[in-house]
Amino acid sequence: MNTDELAGLIKSRRSIRAWQNKPVPEELLMQAVELATWAPNGANAQNWYFYIVLNKSVIKAISDASQAGMSYMASWPETTKSGGMVPPRPPQGQIVPPPPRRSALGDAPAMILVGKTRRENPRDKIIDERAKVDERATRMVEWNVTLNPSMQSVSAGIAYLLLVLHQMGLGATWMTGPLATAKGDIEAILKTPSNMDIIAMIPVGYPADSPTGTRKPVSEVCQVLK
């Protein structure tokens, strides 16, 4: 694959939220996960874990938990006061593609949930201890939380996973929103170990639509220091 072919693959990938009523072969999903584990990761800790869900009852349970969590938050007076959970409109004049057709989360033929295992980092302990007596170390604690190397590592694996699924002709979308309101419920369904956090939900299937997309010019998001 040359650079132009790779660019075509990357630029044609879209978040898919509507799927054909067609099963996804388990072997394809296993292959995609195996390739995802070749993503770069801090200290080669490989602190990711993947749950491939093909059982429709489990997918429905996860979908129901997600909806219940969002409905719970929607019922808060704070949510009403802030104008709801819908993201703000883009700036006037900005070109926005039409929203993709959506299926219910429970309609996805398959789902991959991505976990991040917790592990102790000696550096974290050292910085935390020093922060008790050192103002700069206190700032370093904040920086370390922002950097979150283990989250970055798993996110790299997810990016690889989405690209491989696209190459296989499968559509997927990277979701975190439902976990903000139902993470504990979803982890209970999966029976995750106590040292693991589910950080992403990825419904997968054969696409039922072909959404378009736009990107900011690279000049708006990149600076060259000469």
Please report, for each region that a protein language model flagged, where it lies by residue.
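Acidic, surface-exposed loops and disordered segments
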Residues: M1-K226
